[in-house]
Amino acid sequence: YKDLASDNLIVGKDAYLLYAKATQIFKELNQDPLEEGISELAEISSSAKISSSATISSFCKISDNADIGQEVQIGSGVVIGESTIIGDKTVIHSNVSIYHSVSIGQECIIHAGSVVGSDGLGFVREGQDWEKIEHLGKVIIGNNVEIGSNCSIDRGSVGNTCLDDQVKLDNNVHLAHNVQLGRSSVIAANTAIAGSTTIGKN
């Protein structure tokens, strides 16, 4: 291959995979990291557990008994609900809302504007009115999961909504209550998945 180019080459059997790995290197070299530490403009509960290596930007709210792991990066305007767990090295971009009792694994990425842990659609007819079915379950997200911008993930009604390791969601994806996504599932943009749907791995 040396005769095909006068400059450096990356040579391998899987060119697309090598391209992906190269983009990761260039991103690290070129992106502006968040300002390290905890902003004085963040609102953090005294009962929250925050790693000393975490970054929490301005106008965030970290609620009671939340647990923020090592090297977590949280952008501005993020809300973390009560008793929610954020695993090590996870990145949460600006204006994400994560409700109470959500568990997010390590090295995940959640892009701007997404909502995790809201109630699903659950009502029972009573005469001319609707009686709300409270959602008592959780959202449990594995490791290395990426969630695009403006996604909404409902908590379980009684059981849990679960995303296994390596799941990837494009922008504007909706997961209704009790959805189960198997390892390495990929969901394209503008997809809505109905409640209690199970999708297998890969």
Language-model features and meaning:
Residues 37-202:
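Structural signal for interior beta-strand "rungs" in well-ordered beta-sheet cores
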